[in-house]
A protein has these predicted regions:
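Non-catalytic signal-transmission and effector/linker regions of two-component phosphorelay proteins
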Residues: 1-27, 124, 134-154
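Conserved acidic segment of CheY-like receiver
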Residues: 20-34, 39-43
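The feature encodes the CheY-like receiver
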Residues: 36, 78-79
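Acidic, metal-coordinating helix/loop segments flanking the phosphotransfer/catalytic sites
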Residues: 52-70
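Acidic catalytic/metal-coordinating carboxylates
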Residues: 55-58, 81-87
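His-Asp phosphorelay/catalytic-motif detector in bacterial-type signaling
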Residues: 67-69, 93-101, 124
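Active-site residues of response regulator receiver
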Residues: 74
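Alpha4 helix (beta4-alpha4-beta5 surface) of REC/receiver domains from two-component response regulators
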Residues: 84, 97, 106-128, 140
Length: 154
């Protein structure tokens, strides 16, 4: 399913971001819009509802409106960066149910630092992936989250 275009009507746009009740929602929080769009398209083909960053909304606004089950979070973006987004997730207990996938083109040491950053704040990353990522790794996290959700474990 293509990502709805940004319209001049804020209310229409907000409705488009609201999740469908039965589908697993994946937010691709990455400033590489081509990469994010390609990944969103692949996830949609697999039956997931995926959203990316769109002009006119901050990552936090999209995150709050879309209420994702899984967030694929790039560490290095213009503010708010991945670390600020992780802090936002930690501060909001309602978001503790989600599966967090940390992604970066940085080296393995940076990814390990991000994983420790999460753990120190009481959240566990479901996966830590170095770019270029593989769709199979993302699908594994999404499917595991879907199973937990269907089993009522969250």
């Amino acid at each position: 399913m293509p990502v709805p275009p940004l319209t001049s009507h804020r209310q229409t746009y907000s409705r488009a971001l609201r999740p469908k009740p039965e589908s697993l929602r994946v937010f691709i929080c990455d400033d590489d819009l081509d990469f994010a769009a390609e990944l969103a398209s692949a996830l949609a083909t697999c039956g997931f509802e995926a959203r990316t960053l769109l002009d006119g909304r901050t990552p936090i606004e999209i995150f709050e409106l879309f209420a994702p089950d899984v967030i694929l979070l790039d560490l290095f973006m213009p503010p708010p960066d991945g670390f600020e987004m992780m802090n936002h997730i930690v501060q909001n207990v309602a978001h503790r149910h989600l599966s967090l996938v940390i992604m970066s083109g940085g080296d393995a040491g940076m990814l390990q630092t991000a994983d420790h950053f999460c753990a120190a704040r009481g959240i566990v990353a479901s996966a830590v992936l170095q770019k270029p990522i593989h769709l199979g790794d993302v699908l594994q996290v999404c499917n595991a989250h879907g199973r937990r959700k269907n089993d009522g474990m969250e």
